[in-house]
Amino acid sequence: NDLPAARKAVSRIVGRDTDALTAEGVTKAAVETVAENASDGVIAPLLYMLIGGAPLALTYKAINTMDSMLGYKNEKYLYFGRAAAKLDDVANYIPSRLAALLWVAAAAFTGNSAKGAWCIWRRDRRNHASPNSAQTESACAGALNVQLAGPAYYFGEYYPKPTIGDAVRPIEPEDIRRANRMMYAESLLALALGLVIRGIL
């Protein structure tokens, strides 16, 4: 109910300008962050841990953190930020797609729309400048039957980004909890899958 406080809180986890966000915009930003972090905060580290142990997982996190801090298309970080973003794109290419598929399964386990997650992922997974960011966001949008992404301001500059998903219904604060539940379910599925693979190998 406290929109200024919500804007301030979400500003700590997103790169876009939040000062003028509506309540719907704040909710969208939070849901998008949950979806994207399911990939680069959970699935990717687990995958790299499985492949190369702690050293590879830590290397991945260093690349991902560098992209988060510097990978914006503004004049100050244009060249260094571009290199960080490209490295992150390569590192997340496979994990993001695995995360999207696991999100579809997680949608089924949490009472959300697995069919919607699959269909919107297939349709909108390329609706982003990054080859990876829309992977889990599209699965999340489809699972919730809401529309994510769209135009946003970064450092005062307007970016006409495409939308992801269909606005079957308006997004609401409860969708943040729904997205979190799917992220937790996806994490458990990934952990179980990793343990099975580890046991086989």
Name these PLM-found stretches.
Residues 1-59, 63, 71-201:
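Hydrophobic alpha-helical transmembrane segments
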